[in-house]
Each structure stands twice: as structure tokens, then as C-alpha cells.
Amino acid sequence: MAKISFTPARHRRRKKVLKMAKGYFGSKSTLYKTAHEQVMRSLQYAYRDRKQRKRDFRKLWISRINAGAMLCGMQYSYLMHGLALAKVDVNRKVLADLAHLQPGPVESVKAVEVLQQETQPQPEEKTSLQPEKVLSTELSEEKSDDTLETKPQTTQVKAKKPSLDLSKMLLHELKKLAKEHKVPNFHKLKKAEIVTALKKALAKKII
């Protein structure tokens, strides 16, 4: 039976690992054992940071867009909400490059001046006018025209409070309302919980 030698395969395997460990400090680039340990650890770091890099760049883009929006007197949330309403399909990477490289970046985006008006909350006040109630005056035939007393016409107008759609409001606006209506622990609640708490508070005031 012929003798089998694994020397060539073992040599290729070790040579491959040492090639991947080229440039490492000390024995991590020369000895196979320590080089293999460091290469395995480096591959784990590379796998983890391929995911982490996407998160880090998103944070960087948001901070740059926010800085550019503050120069125009806007907030990041208002800007992104306004761009969605105006159907401007520009991603955060491009917006961050505009804010970082060009002066007055956000102003160059289309419809930004219109967005400031559209994104500001402007509740529409709806007033329902009731028909005028005219108090009829009874005139007596015996009295003359000079002595007639007519009661003034009275109009009763009840203005309803504007019906706010709480679900369409932003989170910081809901927190302001919750602070005004003294909702307990509103800063710890989520958006849906704040909406339900505000509805209960408004219902109590109406009653």
C-alpha cells in the first residue's frame, strides 16, 4: 500500500493563512498558530463591521442634513417630512453631500420654501353657525308707534373647537399637547399611547 503524504496540502494551507496575516504585528504574521488565531478574529470583525458601517454612515448623513437644515431655520424631521409630501426622491446620502460640500445646500432642493409652509401645523378652525334666533315682539294695537318696544335680535354663535387629527401630528407636537393637558409621564410613552391619553384628556374636558 502506497504511503500518502499531506505535506503539499499542509504547506499550501499554511502559506494561505500567512499570506492573509501579512502586515500583522510580531509573531502574528510569522508563526502559523498565532497568525491563524488573528486571521479568524479579523474575519469575525470584518463580518460584524460590514453591518455596522451602514449604521454609522446613516448617522453621519443625518447629522450633516440636520446641520444644513438648521442653517435654513428648519429641523431634520420637518425637512424629510416636507420632501416626502413634495415627492422629492433624494436619498440621505445625496442630501448629506449637498449639505457638506455646497453653501446653502438645502435651499437648492426643489420646493423647500413651499415645504416650510406645508410642514408647519396649521389647524383649520371650523365654526358652525347656528341659525339666528329672532325673538318676536308682540305689538299691541292700543299703543302708538312711538311707544312700541322691540326686542333686539340676538344671534348665538357657537364656535366648535377645531377637530385635531392626532394621528397625523408629529411626535414633538403631541408631546407639547400632552404637556399642556398635564398627561403624566408623557415623555416615556410612545406615539400611539400619547394619542390615546390625549383623547381621554380632551373627552374629560368636554364633559
From Swiss-Prot:
Residues 140-149 have a biased composition (Basic and acidic residues). Belongs to the bacterial ribosomal protein bL20 family. The gene is rplT. It comes from Onion yellows phytoplasma (strain OY-M). Binds directly to 23S ribosomal RNA and is necessary for the in vitro assembly process of the 50S ribosomal subunit. It is not involved in the protein synthesizing functions of that subunit. One of its GO terms (cellular component) is ribonucleoprotein complex. One of its GO terms (molecular function) is rRNA binding. Keywords: Ribonucleoprotein, Ribosomal protein, RNA-binding, rRNA-binding. Residues 117-161 are annotated as: Disordered. The keyword DNA-binding does not apply. The keyword Ribosomal protein applies. GO terms for biological process: DNA-templated transcription termination; ribosomal large subunit assembly; translation. NCBIfam families: PRK14537.1, rplT_bact. InterPro entries: Rho-like_N, Rho_N_sf, Ribosomal_bL20, Ribosomal_protein_bL20_C. CDD domains: Ribosomal_L20. This is Large ribosomal subunit protein bL20. Pfam families: Rho_N, Ribosomal_L20. HAMAP family: Ribosomal_bL20. Gene3D superfamilies: 6.10.160.10, Ribosomal protein L20 (1.10.1900.20).
